[in-house]
Design a protein with these regions (language model features):
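Radical SAM enzyme [4Fe-4S]-AdoMet core and its adjacent flexible, acidic
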Residues: 1-17, 47, 65-78, 124-127, ...
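Flexible, acidic/Gly-rich N-terminal and inter-domain linker regions that tether
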Residues: 1-43, 54-58, 318, 361-366, ...
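N-terminal pre-triad scaffold of radical SAM enzymes
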Residues: 32-58, 98-103, 298-314
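Hydrophobic packing within well-folded, soluble alpha/beta domains
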Residues: 52, 56-59, 117, 121, ...
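Detector for the c-type heme attachment site
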Residues: 59-65, 368-369
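Conserved Radical SAM active-site core
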Residues: 66-131, 135-146
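Immediate flanking context of iron-sulfur cluster ligation sites
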Residues: 346-363
Length: 389
């Protein structure tokens, strides 16, 4: 089996995809103890609606898109933004959530109030990042330019592969939309255009056997249109399809060799303002699942606020895992009629019961694996003797 390539060049080790940034959270996370009030998350994900205009072959929201078709109302989005500003989990930590990721469960930019929601969050002092398919990136330019980062899931280097993977011929539309937003942000000297490695637009690339030969081509496009970063990671099998899948055979040896060769070639296009990242540290040697932790402490570190299941757009459901959207076993609160009630259930007996009942063997590739690694090794075992700096 071919050895995995380095994820980033030495000069780029301080980057937004380096999980060691989580070490900055340990003084907060060490307050996570059964029976005590829990600190609120630093980051919260908000899924605005369960609707998408593409059909990616690996969609990890497919389960929820087929079963739930709601969106969160403008009224409730504003209430969420105001609640997150003041949320206080424990008096041992200052109030408020620092960042919101507007992401999955559907395509966020299709929501009619996305711009207003971004403005409300930013005005409340909360940083915003967005993951989008880019088809509607040409709308709400002013609001989008106020985000810290936007990751666009292009996942291809040619129109042909884009259509094969995503079901629609929208490659050129997405690339032009990205170019336009980058130019707009620079012209208005907006936050999105700040000269910082983690800010700006990122060309996202989920690796699949269909697109493994187009990495260099995609990197060239990303750099040419002004993206700050090219972020690649292997695709994973969605949680609801794991039973019927062999996660060890998604990528063949030839695919991994091609990936290594392509990413090494792509690094030649790096510059001080453009980075190429092939993120594999949450995967095994076959780019397969590698959830090597004993318990999921991440359920106490973040959450996803999602549309309700009762058809009322003023209500919300709160899940604890972005990789298992729609899995009721990981939902802390269903159909909340008041977002402020989230503070009451956070750290509750039900919260700990969910933690106790999670079987790691049933989990897909874990977005939050390093959260649990750090909790187990740095906080519980003090393997790094972190007080000795």
């Amino acid at each position: 089996m071919s050895k995995k390539v380095e994820e980033w060049s030495v000069a780029k080790r301080y980057n937004p995809f380096n999980s060691y940034k989580l070490l900055g959270q340990i003084y907060k996370w060490r307050l996570i103890k059964r029976g005590n009030p829990l600190p609120q998350p630093t980051l919260v994900t908000v899924d605005l609606q369960n609707l998408c205009d593409l059909k990616c072959i690996w969609c990890n929201s497919d389960y929820i898109l087929k079963r739930r078709h709601q969106k969160i109302s403008k009224k409730t989005l504003f209430e969420i933004a105001d609640f997150l500003k003041k949320w206080l989990g424990t008096h041992h930590w200052e109030e408020g959530v620092e960042a919101v990721c507007i992401a999955g469960g559907g395509e966020a930019l299709l929501h009619p109030d996305i711009g207003k929601f971004i403005h409300r969050l930013v005005n409340n002092g909360i940083e915003v990042g967005i993951v989008t398919n880019g088809t509607h990136l040409n709308k709400n330019l002013n609001a989008l330019s106020k985000c810290t980062w936007i990751g666009v899931s292009v996942d291809a280097g040619t129109p042909e592969t884009f259509k094969k993977i995503k079901g629609k011929d929208k490659f050129d539309v997405v690339i032009n939309n990205m170019r336009h937003l980058i130019e707009y942000s620079k012209y208005h000297n907006a936050r999105l255009s700040m000269d910082r490695p983690g800010y700006g637009l990122t060309y996202k690339y989920l690796l699949h056997p269909y697109n493994v030969n187009e990495i260099v081509q995609a990197v060239k496009i990303a750099k040419e249109i002004g993206c700050k970063n090219f972020h690649l990671r292997p695709m994973g099998i969605p949680w609801d399809k794991l039973k019927d899948s062999d996660t060890d055979t998604v990528f063949k040896s030839v695919d991994i060799k091609t990936f290594n060769r392509q990413i090494k070639e792509a690094r030649k296009y790096e510059s001080p303002l453009f980075g190429v990242y092939g993120i594999t540290h949450k995967f095994g040697d076959k780019l397969n699942i590698a959830n090597i932790f004993s318990k999921c402490y991440a359920v106490f570190m973040t959450c996803a606020i999602m549309p309700a299941t009762d058809g009322n757009n003023d209500h919300v459901t709160v899940g604890l895992c972005c990789d298992r959207r729609g899995d009721e076993r990981l939902e802390l609160a269903t159909n909340l009629d008041d977002i402020n009630k989230l503070a009451e259930v956070w750290g509750s007996e039900k919260h700990w019961e969910i933690f106790d009942n999670i079987d790691i063997k049933t989990c897909p590739r874990c977005t939050y694996s390093e959260h649990s690694h750090i909790f187990e090794h740095v906080i519980l075992q003090d393997s790094m003797t972190y007080k000795f700096i």
